[in-house]
Structure formats: C-alpha cells, structure tokens
C-alpha cells in the first residue's frame, strides 16, 4: 500500500474513532490537508468501491463504470451544443476556435467531440443494460 494511502487511511480511522465516541474532530485536523482533501475523498471513495466490488457485489464496479460512462456523455454533448449556439469553443475561459474565424476547425472539433460523446453515451447505456438484464446461471442444475 502506498505511503500516502496509508496516511490517509490512518487519518480517516482517527476521525471515525472520534465520531464513534460522540466527539467531533478538532477544527484543524482535516484542514491541514488543504487542497489534498479532494484527493483524500477521492481515495476514500475508490477504496470503498474496491471493497464493495470484491465483496458480495462483484458486478457493482462494472455497473458503476457503465453508469459513469452513460452519464458523462450527455454533459459533453451539452457543451458541444452550447459551443454551436455560441459559435465558439472555450477551454478554461480561453477561446480555442470560433465559427467565424476558423469554420473548418470549429465544426470539425464539434463534430468529433459530439460523435465521441454520443458513442460513449451509447456504449455506457448498452453496457449498463447488458449488466442489468444479464441473468445469472441457474444453480439448481
């Protein structure tokens, strides 16, 4: 186990022990991590998902991945539609391409990204349906 993961798990156990005793953790205990708090929560969720997928729910990680694929596509499609309406593609506030100045680049970019997002959405929905509708083999035979 990496040292950072071990440190984060130790800190999490310490906080959970304090909460188990009915006490709240000290104010600065978790704020020391600052920007690392997001990484801490991400690591905690990853570990939780790993333990759920290994335990009595082996298909859970596949279902979570399929749902993640299915919901990430519409968000990207929304950004493509927004770019077409606005006539410009922005990334972190900077204009990358505009429909007036670079029409070929603009429409090529929106076509490729939109097609990719539609494909990812369809793939995620198909994977989710296969996982949900796939029957388990009969154990009585």
From Swiss-Prot:
Keywords: Cell membrane, Membrane, Plasmid, Transmembrane, Transmembrane helix
GO cellular component terms, A-Z: plasma membrane
Major subcellular location class: membrane
Keyword Cell membrane recorded: yes
Membrane-protein topology: Multi-pass membrane protein
Membrane spanning residue stretches: 64-84, 112-132
Localization (cell): Cell membrane
Protein name: Uncharacterized protein y4kB
Organism: Sinorhizobium fredii (strain NBRC 101917 / NGR234)
């Amino acid at each position: 186990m990496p040292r950072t993961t071990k440190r984060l798990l130790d800190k999490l156990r310490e906080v959970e022990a304090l909460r188990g005793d009915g006490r709240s953790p000290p104010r600065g205990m978790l704020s020391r991590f600052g920007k690392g708090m997001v990484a801490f929560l991400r690591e905690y969720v990853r570990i939780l998902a790993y333990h759920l997928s290994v335990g009595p729910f082996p298909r859970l990680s596949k279902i979570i991945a399929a749902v993640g694929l299915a919901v990430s596509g519409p968000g990207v499609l929304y950004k493509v539609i927004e770019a077409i309406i606005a006539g410009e593609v922005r990334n972190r506030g900077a204009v990358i391409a505009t429909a007036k100045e670079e029409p070929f680049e603009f429409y090529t970019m929106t076509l490729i990204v939109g097609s990719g997002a539609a494909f990812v959405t369809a793939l995620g929905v198909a994977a989710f349906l296969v996982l949900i509708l796939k029957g388990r083999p009969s154990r009585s035979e």
